[in-house]
Every structure is written in structure tokens, then in C-alpha cells.
């Protein structure tokens, strides 16, 4: 009986992980390595959002626990996550064990990444606002036919998910690994924008935000500069 439940839990874990997307955030906007790696060597931007931003989004599918929809601090370790923690499974606790082990897997990274100070917002792929074909990828004919037959609205090599309830179709999409799953952040949940030290369109951003009708009129804008005496970033408010 317990062996059967363990197999059920393992199957549920794999199913949950296959349908889970991770949106990564950091506690800091000042890390030099992250500006180099994730912001095109200081030419990009860093956006600060409210920690409850995803709670304001409508829940279209109840495929993951509410716990997976909140910010989760990433833990760092030298050992990978495994399923050895599956013990004393019964019908009453199998769902909790599934979620706990999924969280362990989705919030664990190697010690080498500790400098990122990462927090993760974990959501179902089904709750993506927009799904876009990865650069250089093409959709196989069979999958394209499925898309054409569904109630999906095409948008620039992608489609919106709100018009399709064909879960089997989405299973095919997930397994194809052809798409990026994107989530919109409500404008009122954006607090600050940090422009990289080599970002060259500062005036364009400021002039746009000055318009009282602009959805980001309320957002504070900072220009980052590399400190000349310390290995640090200085953020100077420009709007």
C-alpha cells in the first residue's frame, strides 16, 4: 500500500514540476555580477516590483497549491534535491508531501549561486499571459495543426492562453520545449526602475514617464553608476 502511494507521489511530483514555471527575482539591484550576466553588461535595466504582484493576477487554473504562488526564498546547498524524504505516506498526507517535495526541488540551487540572493515566484505554465516561440525554433506540423484547431489567438509567434481549455494540447506544448512562458506584471505593482550604467535611453524613459497618463508615471527611476573606489553600484534618482 505505501509503495503504491509512493509511486503516486513520485508521479504527481513529476507532473507538477513539468507544468511549473519559475519567475526569478533578487533581493538586491546592486550586484555587479548580475548586472553583467542578466542585464547585457550594464546596458539593460532592473525592475523592482511589489512582492504581492502575482496575487493580483486572476487564477485561471487551480493546478498548483497556493504556496507555489507566493514568493519563495531560494536555499543554497552542495547537494541536489532528491525524493529520499518520502516517508510514512498515507492517503491523508500524500498531497502535502507532493507539494513539500516540489517546493524543495524548485527552491534549491548550488552554493555557487548564493550571491544572487534569489527569490522565486512559482506558477503553472497554464497561467502564463503569453506564450512565445523560442528564437530559432519552428513548430512541427502536427503541433501547428493542433494550434490551428484550438481557440487560441495568435500573437507574434505566440498565443494567449485564456482562450483555450484543451489541457491535452498544453501537455503537448510543455513537452515540446519550444516556447517561452511570459507573465505580465500589473503596472501598479512596479515600484522602481534602475537603468544600467551603460543604458543609453534614459531621456526617452523619463520623457515618457512624465506624461500623467502613462501607466508608469508613478514609478521612480534611478540611473546606476559604477563606483570608482569600491566594487559597488551607486543608484542616483533621475525621476
Name each model-derived stretch:
Residues 1-239:
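Catalytic-core loop-and-flanking beta/alpha module that positions acidic residues
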